[in-house]
Curated annotation (Swiss-Prot):
Keywords, alphabetical: Cytoplasm, GTP-binding, Hydrolase, Metal-binding, Nucleotide-binding, Ribosome biogenesis, RNA-binding, rRNA-binding, Zinc
Gene source species: Paraburkholderia xenovorans (strain LB400)
Identification of the protein by name: Small ribosomal subunit biogenesis GTPase RsgA
Cofactor requirement: Zn(2+)
Organism ancestry: Bacteria, Pseudomonadati, Pseudomonadota, Betaproteobacteria, Burkholderiales
Family of this protein: Belongs to the TRAFAC class YlqF/YawG GTPase family. RsgA subfamily.
UniProt binding sites for Zn(2+): 272, 277, 279, 285
Domain CP-type G, chain residue ranges per copy: 83-248
Cell compartments where the protein resides: Cytoplasm
Subunit structure: Monomer. Associates with 30S ribosomal subunit, binds 16S rRNA.
Length: 316
């Protein structure tokens, strides 16, 4: 999928202007104007906040450095954080999901599986990065755990950010140019180190964004977008860093979207006896037959069943 952004709304008058939402904290948003001017702190109009990092918006100037968001451009996709009680959008207009894992500490396959489902459900290309390959005692075990995901067609890139930073950067940067990529990773996997490797002034930018959003000490609690340095052919791209891998939610997905977010399920779906099969205990279910004979891993089906259960519990 191309990294080209959806068409942004057009500002109809001189009192309005367009821009890109590059950071969010609560109802505070930082917008980079399309004309290249200084970034503005913006607020949504009304009580509801329906703005996400990566949105193209129209804002009205309220002062020299503040604005009110009055319109949101057409979105290519939208990702949420969800729990049983609420669902909050946080990133829009993505085309890749980069998941940082490591040989140590032990990474969670449940969280990896959920991230892959989110990518599939939103039309994103997943990219798995296995960091800390220099920890050789754990390397083969990590490779073995990732082999089933390679078999499903997912790309796994092995790096050692600490011991071979330039090789790691070279292995990843060309995969990121021209794309809008969301970066996810559990604590200890090396995600922050990777951001600083790919975005040389990331720490300075984070401090500036924190100040602009008045988020003070909460510097790790906001989602932010970093423009990538241009490649040799002039294509840039962006990297969106978001905290809280554990909060990455899928409860808002319908059962139909969930079943199609498992690539190994898709070819078998037409073979179920019942058109409205839930793939949990129905007779003649092609998915359950594939689980029984080993074509589909039991762990993957268990994740699907858990996600269906969680989706049924959400308060809508």
């Amino acid at each position: 999928m191309s990294g080209r952004s959806p068409k942004a709304p057009r500002a109809p008058s001189s009192t309005r202007a367009g821009g890109l939402v590059v950071a969010a904290h609560g109802r505070h948003y930082l917008v980079a104007p399309d004309d290249g001017g200084a970034m503005l702190q913006c607020f949504p109009r009304g009580k509801r906040s329906e703005v996400a990092v990566g949105d193209h918006v129209i804002y009205e100037l309220a002062s020299a450095d503040q604005g009110v968001i009055v319109e949101i451009g057409e979105r290519r996709n939208l990702l949420y954080r969800s729990d049983q009680y609420k669902s909050k959008l946080f990133a829009a207009n993505l085309d890749q999901l980069l998941i940082v894992l490591a040989t140590e500490p032990h990474f969670s396959e449940d969280l990896l599986g959920r991230a892959l489902v989110a990518a599939e459900a939103n039309g994103l290309k997943p990219l798995i990065v296995l960091n800390k390959t220099d920890v050789t005692d754990e390397l083969e075990g990590a490779r073995k755990r990732l082999e089933p995901y390679r078999a499903l067609g997912y790309t796994v890139v092995e790096v050692s950010i600490r011991t071979q930073p330039e090789a790691a950067r070279a292995a990843l940067i060309e995969r990121l140019h021209g794309h809008s990529t969301l970066l996810l990773g559990q604590s200890g996997m090396g995600k922050s180190t990777l951001v600083n490797l790919l975005i040389p002034d990331a720490e300075v930018a984070t401090r500036e964004i924190s100040t602009a959003l008045n988020s003070g000490r909460h510097t790790t609690t906001f989602t932010r977008l970093y423009p990538l340095p241009d490649s040799a052919d002039g294509t840039g791209g962006s990297l969106i860093d978001s905290p809280g891998f554990q909060e990455f939610g899928l409860h808002h997905l319908t059962e139909g979207r969930l079943e199609r977010a498992f690539p190994e399920f898709r070819p078998l779906l037409p073979n179920c006896r019942f058109y409205n099969c839930h793939h949990l205990h129905e007779p003649g279910c092609a998915i359950l037959e594939a689980v029984a004979d080993g074509r589909i891993r039991r762990e993957r089906h268990a994740l699907y069943a858990q996600l269906v259960h969680e989706a049924s519990q959400i308060v809508r």
